[in-house]
Structure formats: structure tokens, C-alpha cells
A protein has these predicted regions:
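Short acidic capping loops at alpha-helix termini that bridge into adjacent secondary structure
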Residues: 35, 77-80
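Residue-level preference for beta-strand/loop junctions
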Residues: 22, 46, 94-98
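Conserved Nudix-box catalytic region and its N-terminal flanking loop in Nudix hydrolases
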Residues: 26, 31-72
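Unchanged
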Residues: 55-78, 86-142, 153-155
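Acidic, metal-coordinating catalytic segment for phosphate/diphosphate chemistry
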Residues: 1-27
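Short beta-strand element of the conserved SAM-dependent methyltransferase core
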Residues: 7, 28, 102-106
């Protein structure tokens, strides 16, 4: 698999090597009491997911997490922990993403917005179906972390 392609400048014809790099994303496990917030996605792939999204240019991961939580759930969050980073090239059918997952606390009632048609509270041990991406595994890792303070598997 080629990790770069050549593109030509339309003005001068100079060939530029353009690298094909993974896209950085964040996911936010938002805790409200003993439940977590999940969104039902408006866009493909359809299903339930942890709120999150793509990092904008010039934005930190924490800023992205806070922005995405607000856009998709209407909630103001307090980031309390970085859980892990997930980098399986096949984790997202839209392309290779690398996601940093945060745990956050919030108060209030989630309301779907932006590309989330719904935002609802669920017990992390009773997830809706279908779950998108690798988010079922992320929630399993979250439960292990909540129980033991660590995650035993490597990514």
C-alpha cells in the first residue's frame, strides 16, 4: 500500500509528494450519574456511538473533546481523564483514524445536535445495537478501567 501520491501544481506543473496520513479524532465518554451518553448517528455509518469527532486545524485534543461534546449532546463537560488512544487502521470504515478517548463528567439532559440525531443515557453494561466503529470495545475498556484503574490490553 502506497503511503503517498504525487500531485501536480495546476499553475507550474511541479510534482509534490502528498503523504496519506491517519486523521486525528477524539471520543468522549460522558458520565452522568451512573450512566453514559451515547449518540445515534445521523450520517453513515448509522448506529450508536460515543460522542466525538475530527480535530480541527489549530485545535487541541481537549478543545476538540469539549466542542464535540457540546455540538453532539448540548452538554458542557469537564474532562477528568484520558482513557486511551485507539489506532487500528480498520476501526472506522470511512478511513484510517487515530482516536484519543477521554472520560468526562456532565450534568443535565443530553440532546442530539450536529450530526447526532439523538443523544441518550445508557448503562455502560447495557448498550444499544448496533454500536459503530470500535466503540463497544472502548466501553469495555472503560468498564475495566473503572473497576481496576487500568486497561490490560495493548492497542
Amino acid at each position: 500500500m502506497s503511503t503517498y501520491q504525487f500531485i501536480k501544481c495546476p499553475k507550474c506543473g511541479y510534482e509534490i509528494k502528498q503523504y496519506k496520513n491517519p486523521t486525528p479524532t477524539v471520543d468522549i465518554i460522558i458520565e452522568i450519574d451512573d450512566k453514559i451518553v451515547l449518540i445515534e448517528r445521523k450520517n453513515q455509518p448509522h448506529g450508536w456511538a460515543i460522542p466525538g469527532g475530527f480535530v480541527d486545524y489549530g485545535e487541541s485534543l481537549i478543545e476538540t473533546a469539549i466542542r464535540e461534546a457540546k455540538e453532539e449532546t448540548g452538554l458542557d463537560v469537564e474532562i477528568i481523564h484520558q482513557l486511551a488512544t485507539y489506532s487500528d487502521p480498520n476501526r472506522d470504515p470511512r478511513g484510517h483514524t487515530i482516536s484519543t478517548v477521554y472520560i468526562a463528567k456532565a450534568k443535565g439532559t443530553p440532546k442530539g445536535g450536529d450530526d447526532a440525531q439523538k443523544a441518550e443515557l445508557f448503562s455502560p453494561t447495557e448498550l444499544p445495537s448496533p454500536m459503530c466503529f470500535d466503540h463497544k470495545q472502548i466501553i469495555e475498556d472503560y468498564l475495566e478501567f473503572k473497576k481496576t484503574g487500568k486497561i490490560s490490553r495493548l492497542f
